[in-house]
Amino acid sequence: MPNKPRRNEILPHENLRIDIFFFRITKTDLIPYAQTMYDSFFRILTSSKSYENEYVMRAVMRLSSALYEGILPCLSQLMEKLVMILQRSSKNPNKPNFNHYLFESITVLIRTSVAQNPATLEQFEQVLFPIFTPIFTDDVAEFIPYVLQIIGFLLESHLTGSIPDAYRALFQSILTPSFWDRSGNIPALSRLLQAYIEKAGETIVKEKLVRIFDRN
């Protein structure tokens, strides 16, 4: 027995039902229009009236995810725009959904690019670490869990026993007791600490790890 329509529900005629798979949009469909779409998105996100529009930032994230390696031709432009937005938002991080999609967009770029070309790892570090450092020093609590996750992934992508000096300098910051007092930081901190132990345990971790646990 067919289901009874709910009030105000409009059901299509049987002859008008269309296979939804016919309309599935693929990466190939998106690539020719990607640049135009990004230009439109960032025109909104750089406008003084709508620069923290969470729906547009979500669209950036979803388009970037759908494009996968098709995103590479736009990589430099996207990182420049996203870093600019990150710098601006870090001064007043009062839009949690927007912030989430912003960091998700950055993460998609990193994961896709490093998977296709490991040499881009250093480029991301050069661009992002100068932004991440003041987030730590200014204790921007809303951003720290996201930053820790991204740094953890970047560090995990390095060969064991070989990490840049920037990570060594940062290690001192992640041992800050206040970071560990916030439950929201713990998962990302734990993963990042594990990455430090795996990649450079003998050189920078062993003698300093006791600081986390010896807090009398």
Go through the PLM ranges and name each one.
Residues 1-216:
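Karyopherin-beta/Importin-beta family HEAT-repeat alpha-solenoid scaffold
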